[in-house]
């Protein structure tokens, strides 16, 4: 019997230790946020935990973060952690998964609060600050020019030569203003295009076509009345799941709620059964909603619900 490559990939991924974090602006640099989960730490020796963690994101950039320890837990040192957070403009309830690849190197996947995975670096806060500073200097210069023009008018009658110079100066000022407006419009358009390129998610059609994804798998489904008790899983997505009954963890995008749901394999397909009804009540999920599931680890999914 031929083996399923997607299932083998998930099976191999399951052997790798991983943990997740949800970053909120209010406490994204606190020691608790930087803590490394105990269930993860116990798989490593003290020697391994005395060095650095290396983070690598989907677009190839990497960061080194030192590990420290207090009487209660291991945690990531603030300097390296904050550089990673600032460089990626994090802090808006992003969902991060850290998968160990050996020798304290980690693949980090970043999901925005709408469930989309970041595939390219966002425009950094530093560049925002830089553009704001340039804009401010231009505005100040423009204001100074306007003040000079107003002052010249307040001095009373002028000669013909002065009038000509004033007209030339006014045309120059208007041209500069028009040029600045065109530049700002171009920058806004460029930022919008970059933002669209930054985020990518595997669409429902791609998963249904059975095309394997090297980055993220997921599906969308409309909730009918019967789907409140148990949820049928699209067959192509089932290729990423185990071939036997197991328990999976489903996360709310706020990072504070999780549910354990039984994944059942039947002759007619796979379903979410035990625990699903409770999830629908607590999330909540109701008839008419659209659920988007994103596979973040082999046995963990992120659920984002859209209301009609």
Curated annotation (Swiss-Prot):
Alphabetical list of Pfam families matching this protein: B3 (PF02362)
Amino acid composition bias (Basic and acidic residues), ranges on this chain: 134-145, 178-198
Compositional bias ranges of the Polar residues kind: 121-133, 149-166
Compartments where located: Nucleus
Gene Ontology cellular-component terms listed: nucleus
GO molecular function, one term: DNA binding
Cystine connections: none
Protein name, as recorded: B3 domain-containing protein REM23
The organism of origin for this protein: Arabidopsis thaliana (Mouse-ear cress)
This protein's encoding gene: REM23
